[in-house]
């Protein structure tokens, strides 16, 4: 479920007309719904009510401080993968004792910082990392709380770039080696064994891979509970969301279609609850995309329409530097017109355009939606049937709340877009748009 809907031919986020937000803050603009983020968090939290659990939001999905504050206030912990993410979470008011630190390449500085702040656990990805953390903690006269990330070698049925639980992936320690590594850890003076962690991938739309991984690791978890009195089992994140037809060009009931909607939160919990309940441990979850993916859109304006002998291109002001998912993964994002113009009056919309058939209700064209970046891979949609569009039209790239701005760059020396947050009938900036001066602010002339 999300809070984007059409009202009188205009797209709204909660109670805010998104066209007005675009006029106020410009485009490209990431616009997030606070209500959607909190609704998804509460649905998951309530579904797990009978289980001792902690939801640690995966900061990598969307690290905007306004989003982090929302989730902190709701009771979330945080899954962080860098010192920078820990810093962000703490600046948003997070409790370090509710933060877990993952990632295969933690640096000395990051480990020291996390120890100083008192994170709940380091998720250990290799024996080399275990030795390194023990060495650093010893030098600081501290004990580092750890959980091994165990790789169950389970096929997650997702994109190869976001599959993380197979034996050929770089993540975690093989299940068959884990017990021996735990035994080594138990003898290290600066290590405190706290739990077990797994994470098999992202954008997974079926329950079977999660259940298979849990059941595969469960015997090890039970053994470790007896031997080392571990506190928790973290099952990671990875539950997918709907990208295709995420608003179905105005349809209000896309989420009711089993064909277009992946696993629901309740279906996911119903599947994983039995094997987890039997373990009698605190369960950690690390959702990211699930909480914020459908809570955000990227607003962009059409600059030009270009036709060639083979193609019709709609060139927009957002580029692959703003949202790289289509170029990087071949990902699908629904793209819809913000205004369905039905009245010929120039007062019918903030843009002052009128006098044509409503976008989405008349003629359609097969088009490529592309950005201004100098790469053929700079596209948002290819051969997509879309309504008749023209220069100046405002479009919404749906389901852009996760892995959107956080993966943005200054490629082609393009300033980063702005971000804004909606709560009910209010919208406020949560990140200023970069200026061209910002592009060179940190550069210095070499002194030879």
Residue map of PLM features:
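A charged N-terminal "starter" segment
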Residues: 1-144, 187-192, 222-228, 425-448
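Conserved, mostly hydrophobic/aromatic
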Residues: 37, 60, 82, 114, ...
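Active-site-proximal loop/turn and secondary-structure-junction residues that shape catalytic pockets
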Residues: 61-63, 84-85, 105-106, 126-128, ...
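Short acidic, glycine/serine/threonine-rich loops at helix termini
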Residues: 68, 91, 111-116, 133-136, ...
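Hydrophobic residues within beta-strands of alpha/beta enzymes
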Residues: 78-79, 99, 122, 196, ...
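Active-site loop/helix belt of alpha/beta enzymes
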Residues: 152-304, 414
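Charged (often Lys/Glu-rich) extended helix/loop segments that serve as interaction or gating elements
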Residues: 265, 271-273, 280-343, 362-448
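Glycine-biased, low-complexity coil/linker segments
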Residues: 352-357, 361
């Amino acid at each position: 479920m999300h809070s984007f809907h059409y009202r009188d031919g205009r797209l709204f986020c909660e109670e805010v007309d998104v066209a007005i937000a675009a006029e106020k803050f410009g485009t490209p603009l990431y616009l997030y719904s606070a209500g959607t983020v909190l609704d998804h968090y509460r649905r998951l939290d309530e579904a797990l009510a009978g289980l001792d659990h902690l939801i640690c939001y995966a900061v990598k999905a969307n690290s905007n401080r306004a989003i982090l504050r929302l989730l902190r206030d709701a009771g979330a912990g945080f899954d962080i993968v860098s010192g920078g993410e820990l810093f962000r979470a703490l600046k948003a008011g997070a409790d370090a004792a509710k933060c877990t630190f993952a990632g295969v390449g933690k640096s000395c500085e990051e480990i020291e910082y996390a120890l100083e702040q008192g994170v709940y656990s380091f998720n250990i990805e290799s024996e080399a990392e275990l030795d390194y953390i023990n060495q650093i903690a010893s030098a600081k006269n501290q004990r580092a709380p750890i959980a091994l990330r165990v790789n169950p070698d389970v096929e997650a049925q997702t994109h190869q770039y976001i599959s993380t639980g197979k034996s050929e992936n770089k993540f975690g320690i093989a299940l068959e080696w884990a017990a021996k590594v735990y035994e080594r850890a138990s003898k290290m003076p600066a290590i405190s064994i706290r739990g077990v962690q797994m994470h098999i991938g992202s954008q997974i739309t079926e329950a079977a891979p999660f259940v298979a991984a849990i059941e595969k690791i469960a015997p090890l978890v039970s053994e470790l509970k007896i031997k080392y009195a571990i506190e928790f089992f973290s099952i990671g994140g990875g539950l997918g969301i709907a990208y295709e037809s995420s608003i179905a060009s105005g349809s209000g009931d896309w989420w009711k279609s089993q064909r277009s909607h992946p696993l629901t939160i309740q279906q996911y919990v119903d599947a994983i609850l039995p094997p987890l309940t039997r373990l009698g441990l605190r369960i950690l979850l690390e959702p990211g995309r699930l909480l914020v993916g459908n809570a955000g859109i990227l607003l962009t304006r059409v600059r030009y329409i270009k036709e060639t002998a083979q193609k019709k291109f709609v060139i927009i002001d957002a580029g692959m530097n703003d949202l790289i998912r289509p170029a990087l993964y071949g990902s699908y994002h629904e793209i819809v017109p913000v205004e369905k113009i039905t009245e010929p009056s120039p007062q019918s919309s903030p843009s002052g355009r009128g006098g044509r058939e409503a976008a989405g209700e008349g003629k359609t064209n097969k088009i490529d939606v592309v950005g201004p970046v100098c790469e053929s891979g700079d596209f948002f949609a290819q051969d997509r049937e879309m309504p008749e569009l023209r220069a100046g039209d405002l479009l919404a790239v749906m389901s852009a709340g996760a892995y959107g701005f956080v993966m943005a760059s200054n490629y082609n020396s393009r300033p980063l877009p702005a971000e804004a947050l909606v709560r009910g009938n209010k919208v406020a900036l949560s990140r200023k748009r970069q200026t061209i001066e910002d592009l060179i602010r940190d550069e210095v002339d070499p002194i030879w």
